[in-house]
């Protein structure tokens, strides 16, 4: 949510912990195939747009992968590298897209080896980087 809003509004800085959902096509397709439990988000998208197979573009338009440029404010991303596979599936692609962004403000990545989904709140390294980011903005 914070990352998406950063393409719309300027602030004194944005912090995104384990940003997502990065790829709703992938996530909702797993749900449709019964590989993971259904979520309210994918169920609602399916009711509005049909399946990921019949209308993948609608799902992609809502995915964070579609919002990897145009950041109006500096942003700190914190991602635990032991997060769920569904989160990490698109993380390298998202990170690369943000790193090559030519119309973004400054982006900083903190990847926590061994960290899980809540790394911003559980990792001393992430907390330190969080505090440094806050103080600089």
Regions found by a protein language model. Name each.
Residues 13-15, 73-76:
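Hydrophobic beta-strand segments of well-ordered beta-sheets in folded domains
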Residues 76-78, 85, 90-137:
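C-terminal catalytic histidine-bearing segment of alpha/beta-hydrolase fold enzymes
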Residues 65-70, 136:
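Surface-exposed acidic, glycine-flexible loop patches that form ligand/cofactor-binding
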Residues 19, 24, 79-82, 115:
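Cell-envelope and extracellular/periplasmic
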Residues 19, 24-67:
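Mobile cap/lid helix-loop segments that gate and shape the active-site cleft of serine hydrolases
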Residues 1-9, 14:
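Short glycine-enriched nucleophile-adjacent loop
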Residues 7-8, 68-71, 103:
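Extracellular/periplasmic catalytic domains that process cell-envelope and extracellular macromolecules
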Residues 8, 31-33, 93-97:
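Glycine-rich, phosphate-binding/catalytic loops in enzymes
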């Amino acid at each position: 949510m914070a990352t998406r809003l950063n393409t719309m509004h300027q602030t004194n800085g944005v912090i995104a912990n384990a940003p997502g959902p990065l790829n709703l096509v992938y996530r909702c397709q797993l749900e449709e195939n019964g590989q993971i439990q259904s979520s309210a988000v994918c169920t609602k998208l399916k009711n509005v747009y049909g399946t990921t197979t019949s209308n993948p573009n609608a799902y992609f338009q809502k995915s964070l992968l579609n919002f990897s440029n145009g950041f109006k404010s500096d942003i700190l991303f914190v991602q635990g590298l032991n997060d769920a596979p569904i989160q990490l599936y698109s993380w390298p692609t998202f990170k690369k897209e943000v790193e090559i962004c030519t119309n973004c403000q400054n982006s900083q990545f903190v990847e926590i080896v061994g960290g899980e989904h809540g790394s911003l709140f559980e990792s001393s390294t992430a907390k330190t980087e969080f505090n440094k980011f806050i103080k600089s903005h």
